[in-house]
């Protein structure tokens, strides 16, 4: 039953991506990106709906050409979650998706082209109240910066970002957020630290091309965890070569671990050893699978023996300590004993009951004003 996060977040300007606030005092938004063919409208809509069910706040969709832009418009009509169009090279694509109701444009002004083209995109965004994300990436730095620095560095990423920030500010456009991504954790972290000192715009955090499910999760947790713990970051995207739904899950798990945002069950579980009085690993796997649908933030401790079990259980909403028999704690107090027979069934029942009680209590509190 952990309280609020002790982290003091960096002050930033608030912008709106559709109905979702980003920056300022808004909760840190969790993003993902579709990996389906945008021209396959049905498949992309289905994937976005799965992401929304997982709790995503904002979804980015790649729009590589005009056919994809038209498909994007049809996709936008069929989903509720705000959509970001990922645009490179052809400014006319950005103009078209702006007409079709995009919620945010992700562009790199450096590859959109001449000043008049960038101005056209900015004017379209301003006229329709569409924010822009300046997305700088270590793998696509401008040639002059590559020549100047010899290789991607934090300073090079920040110089690129500030160049584009100044570009938008010259056009009197302030409704934007910025990212400076790299696949190297140290490079990305240092770039964000430097950039955070220079601008007030909200920052979109990510370790780009982080890797597969396991390696990408670790890289992202380390890099984003360092920044978030320092109060840097207003929205996050976990880049994984995996099902995009996993990006959302990992994103929330990172935020939960720092007490920055809660959604669903926060499990505290021991790695198990020969002292365990029930199969901890099997119990955890079953509980996680069964309770994925629960959105209510609850702390649930699953500890296999009495060494650390009582202490952890007393700090959780629901706690299980292995013993003969096993002991259940509810709100820190011993409540009932359970044998290993139907252990998971009984735990699931208690957790769902506790979640329902919390929803009812929260609703009553809101009703009282």
UniProtKB/Swiss-Prot annotation:
EC main group: oxidoreductase
The enzyme's E.C. designation: 1.17.7.3
Source organism (scientific name): Pseudomonas fluorescens (strain ATCC BAA-477 / NRRL B-23932 / Pf-5)
Protein name listed in UniProt: 4-hydroxy-3-methylbut-2-en-1-yl diphosphate synthase (flavodoxin)
Record GO terms (molecular function): 4 iron, 4 sulfur cluster binding; 4-hydroxy-3-methylbut-2-en-1-yl diphosphate synthase activity (ferredoxin); 4-hydroxy-3-methylbut-2-enyl-diphosphate synthase activity (flavodoxin); iron ion binding
Keywords: 4Fe-4S, Iron, Iron-sulfur, Isoprene biosynthesis, Metal-binding, Oxidoreductase
Keyword Nucleotide-binding: no
Cofactor binding annotation: Binds 1 [4Fe-4S] cluster.
Protein family per UniProt: Belongs to the IspG family.
Domain of life: Bacteria
Role summary: Converts 2C-methyl-D-erythritol 2,4-cyclodiphosphate (ME-2,4cPP) into 1-hydroxy-2-methyl-2-(E)-butenyl 4-diphosphate.
Reaction equations catalysed: (2E)-4-hydroxy-3-methylbut-2-enyl diphosphate + oxidized [flavodoxin] + H2O + 2 H(+) = 2-C-methyl-D-erythritol 2,4-cyclic diphosphate + reduced [flavodoxin]
Pathway: Isoprenoid biosynthesis; isopentenyl diphosphate biosynthesis via DXP pathway; isopentenyl diphosphate from 1-deoxy-D-xylulose 5-phosphate: step 5/6
Gene Ontology terms: biological process: isopentenyl diphosphate biosynthetic process, methylerythritol 4-phosphate pathway; terpenoid biosynthetic process
Pfam families xref list: GcpE
Cofactors, names only: [4Fe-4S] cluster
Residues the record lists as binding [4Fe-4S] cluster: 270, 273, 305, 312
InterPro entries reported in the protein's UniProt record: Dihydropteroate_synth-like_sf, IspG_bac, IspG_bac-typ, NO2/SO3_Rdtase_4Fe4S_sf
């Amino acid at each position: 039953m952990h309280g609020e996060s002790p982290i003091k977040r960096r002050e930033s300007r608030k912008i709106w991506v559709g109905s979702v606030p980003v920056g300022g005092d808004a909760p840190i938004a969790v993003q993902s990106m579709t990996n389906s063919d945008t021209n396959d409208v049905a498949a992309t809509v289905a994937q976005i709906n799965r992401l929304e069910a997982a709790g995503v706040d904002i979804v980015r969709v790649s729009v590589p050409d005009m056919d994809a832009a038209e498909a994007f418009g049809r996709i936008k009509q069929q989903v509720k979650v705000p959509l970001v169009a990922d645009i490179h090279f052809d400014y006319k694509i950005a103009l078209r998706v702006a007409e079709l109701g995009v919620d945010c444009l992700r562009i790199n002004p450096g590859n959109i082209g001449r000043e008049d083209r960038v101005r056209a995109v900015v004017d379209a965004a301003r006229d329709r109240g569409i924010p822009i994300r300046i997305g700088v990436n270590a793998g696509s730095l401008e040639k002059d910066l590559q020549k100047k620095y010899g290789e991607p560095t934090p300073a090079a990423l920040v110089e690129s970002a500030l160049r584009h920030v100044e570009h938008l500010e010259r056009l009197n456009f302030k409704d934007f957020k910025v990212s400076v991504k790299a696949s190297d954790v140290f490079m990305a972290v240092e770039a964000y630290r430097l950039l955070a000192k220079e601008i007030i715009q909200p920052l979109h955090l990510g370790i780009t091309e982080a890797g597969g499910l396991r390696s990408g999760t670790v890289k992202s947790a380390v890099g984003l965890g360092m920044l978030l713990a320092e109060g840097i970051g207003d929205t996050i995207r976990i880049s994984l070569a995996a099902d995009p739904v996993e990006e959302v899950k990992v994103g929330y798990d990172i935020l939960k671990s720092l007490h920055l945002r809660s959604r669903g069950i926060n499990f505290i579980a021991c790695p198990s050893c020969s002292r365990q009085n029930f199969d901890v690993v099997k119990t955890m796997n079953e509980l996680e699978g069964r309770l994925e649908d629960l959105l209510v933030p609850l702390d649930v401790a699953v500890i296999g023996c009495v060494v650390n079990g009582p202490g952890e259980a007393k700090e959780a909403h629901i706690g299980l300590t292995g013993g003969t028999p096993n002991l259940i704690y509810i709100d820190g107090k011993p409540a009932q004993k359970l044998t290993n027979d139907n252990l998971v069934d009984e735990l699931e029942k208690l957790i769902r009951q506790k979640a329902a009680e919390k929803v009812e209590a929260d609703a009553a509190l809101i009703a009282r004003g």
